[in-house]
């Protein structure tokens, strides 16, 4: 039986994981790419490459280093993305779930589009997104640095099959997710 693979992406703090959690309630597999990337970074071989390249493998120091320089971030992604993509493919192959969601901020940038059947872009206005991230402990400077290295929503939208606007109330996002779910299940 062929699985339906859905990618959920969006800018840092847009609400990708919120949308993924809403869909997870429907008994489907959600793969959290950020969590897998953190696990990949702990792999001995990967950690060694990171240490050789950056002199540190600590998450906070590494984030500070790579989110201040596009070239450094690119080098980190070249180390992390290959094992991450292998792990995602392995999980997708092993699951018995008919629908699989990949929750990843860099689906488009990391060229994961060949792995998915449809792309959901979660958008959120800048003011709301920044406010939510500040409440989570990020400074406006950190937010700007991380967001600055991601493809803009206006560019990502060209790849999207669906767009969910997470700028408003949770109920409104839930309504959009329900509409998305009906569309997804009609494809199966």
Where are these regions (language model features)?
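Walker A/P-loop
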Residues: 17
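P-loop (Walker A) phosphate-binding loop of NTP-binding proteins
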Residues: 11, 23
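ATP-dependent small-molecule kinase phosphotransfer cores
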Residues: 35-96
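ATP-dependent NMP and nucleoside kinases share a basic, alpha-helical "lid"
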Residues: 87-94, 99-135
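Small-molecule kinase domains that catalyze NTP-dependent phosphoryl transfer to phosphate-bearing small molecules
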Residues: 96, 114, 138-185
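ATP-binding Walker
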Residues: 14
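Hydrophobic anchor at the beta1->P-loop junction of P-loop NTPases
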Residues: 8
């Amino acid at each position: 039986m062929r699985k339906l693979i859905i990618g959920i992406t969006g800018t840092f703090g847009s609400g990708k994981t919120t949308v993924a959690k809403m869909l997870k309630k429907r008994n489907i597999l959600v793969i959290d790419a950020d969590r897998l990337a953190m696990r990949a970074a702990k792999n001995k071989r990967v950690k060694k490459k990171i240490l050789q390249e950056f002199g540190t493998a600590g998450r906070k120091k590494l984030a500070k280093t790579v989110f201040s320089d596009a070239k450094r971030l690119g080098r980190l992604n070249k180390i992390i993305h290959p094992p991450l993509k292998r792990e995602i493919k392995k999980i997708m192959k092993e699951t018995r779930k008919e629908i699989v969601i990949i929750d990843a901020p860099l689906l488009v940038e990391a060229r994961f589009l060949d792995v998915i059947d449809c792309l959901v872009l979660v958008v959120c206005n800048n003011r709301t997104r920044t406010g939510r991230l500040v409440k989570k402990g990020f400074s406006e400077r950190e937010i700007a640095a991380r967001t600055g290295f991601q493809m803009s929503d206006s560019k990502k939208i060209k790849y999207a099959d669906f767009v969910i606007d997470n700028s408003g109330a949770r109920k409104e996002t839930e309504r959009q997710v329900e509409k998305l779910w009906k569309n997804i299940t009609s494809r199966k």
